[in-house]
């Protein structure tokens, strides 16, 4: 399993970014900078820049967090059982650095039927047209 990013990264993360990526926290719903992003491009892990999701797989699930129906590649993310909060969920972590991203649920659209519910605070986005980077 991949390790968390170097300790020096902690100094660069905001409190909410640290809470989400390093402590498996959750940002408040409808608060993330990338929730309503409609631009074409790639969503990366905030901690290591691993490509995680393509904009073409993003959809509005109404849940308050960016939602995607599949990762960019098979090994972009890893899955862990999460039995916290008296429920069973599947946690999603970066496949490269192990940063917490969010959870995946079996109620998404086709072609996968999955909904990757991802914290904006765990992501950065690179616009494919301008190269501009936005940090969630």
From Swiss-Prot:
What EC numbers are recorded for this enzyme?
1.8.4.12
Cofactor needs: Zn(2+)
Which first-to-last residue range defines the signal peptide? none
Q: Which UniProt keywords apply?
A: Metal-binding, Oxidoreductase, Zinc
GO BP terms: namely:
protein repair; response to oxidative stress
Q: What is this protein called?
A: Peptide methionine sulfoxide reductase MsrB
Binding of Zn(2+) occurs at: 45, 48, 94, 97
Name its species. Answer: Photorhabdus laumondii subsp. laumondii (strain DSM 15139 / CIP 105565 / TT01) (Photorhabdus luminescens subsp. laumondii)
Matching Pfam families:
SelR
* Reactions catalysed: L-methionyl-[protein] + [thioredoxin]-disulfide + H2O = L-methionyl-(R)-S-oxide-[protein] + [thioredoxin]-dithiol
């Amino acid at each position: 399993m991949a390790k968390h990013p170097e300790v020096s990264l902690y100094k660069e993360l905001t409190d909410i970014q640290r809470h989400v990526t390093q402590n498996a926290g959750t940002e408040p719903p409808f608060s993330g900078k990338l929730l309503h992003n409609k631009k074409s491009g790639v969503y990366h892990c905030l901690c290591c820049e691993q490509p995680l999701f393509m904009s073409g797989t993003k959809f509005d699930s109404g849940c308050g967090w960016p939602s995607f129906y599949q990762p960019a590649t098979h090994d972009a993310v890893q899955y862990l059982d999460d039995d916290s909060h008296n429920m069973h969920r599947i946690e999603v972590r970066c496949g490269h650095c192990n940063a917490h991203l969010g959870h995946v649920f079996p109620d998404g659209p086709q072609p996968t039927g999955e909904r990757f519910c991802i914290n904006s605070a765990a992501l950065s986005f690179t616009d494919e047209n301008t190269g501009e980077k936005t940090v969630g």
